């Protein structure tokens, strides 16, 4: 396991995830009978500040179809949580117009790189081009100055 699991923190995430899914109308319990499902959900709603009990609620009452999706969501959230601790792993987002994204994605695919690697490569290419243009301009000015002095 790459990222440390923090039981209390993750139990809070699980509680929020389950409550959100319930409010969106998804069945979060394994019960078909409405009264049993409502009873289990009511119990869950009382467990917001009791992380140990949230995990036991999950073991007893969760809808099996929801369990894997919840695990994936928590795993992704754990990764984002730990990556956010360090500047170099913290993710940022930018808004692109669809056509720009499409061209960038195509270029990245042709180069066999990620979108981030492609953006870095394009920036480096532009910086090298700018540096080369400045060197040529300086060289041209130096040559003109040398030729102008000899006459």
Swiss-Prot record:
This protein's GO CC annotations: cytoplasm
Gene3D superfamilies cross-referenced by the UniProt entry: MatP, N-terminal domain, Met repressor-like
Localization (cell): Cytoplasm
Entry function: Required for spatial organization of the terminus region of the chromosome (Ter macrodomain) during the cell cycle. Prevents early segregation of duplicated Ter macrodomains during cell division. Binds specifically to matS, which is a 13 bp signature motif repeated within the Ter macrodomain.
Pfam family, one: MatP_C
Signal peptide: none
Family: Belongs to the MatP family.
Coiled coil start-end: none
Keyword Ligase annotated: no
GO biological process entries: cell division; regulation of DNA-templated transcription
Underlying gene: matP
Protein name, entry field: Macrodomain Ter protein
């Amino acid at each position: 396991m790459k990222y440390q699991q923090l039981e209390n923190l993750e139990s809070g995430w699980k509680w929020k995830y389950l409550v959100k899914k319930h409010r969106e109308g998804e069945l979060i319990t394994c019960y078909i009978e409405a009264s049993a499902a409502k009873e289990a959900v009511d119990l869950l709603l009382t467990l917001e500040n009791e992380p140990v009990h949230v995990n036991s609620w999950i073991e007893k009452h969760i809808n099996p179809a929801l369990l894997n999706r919840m695990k994936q969501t928590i795993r992704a959230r754990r990764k984002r949580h730990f990556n956010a601790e360090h500047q170099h792993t913290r993710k940022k987002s930018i808004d692109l117009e669809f056509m720009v994204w499409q061209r960038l994605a195509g270029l990245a695919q042709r180069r066999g790189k990620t979108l981030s690697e492609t953006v870095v490569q394009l920036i480096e290419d532009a910086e090298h081009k700018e540096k080369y243009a400045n060197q040529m301009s300086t060289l041209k000015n130096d040559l003109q100055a040398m030729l102008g002095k000899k006459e």
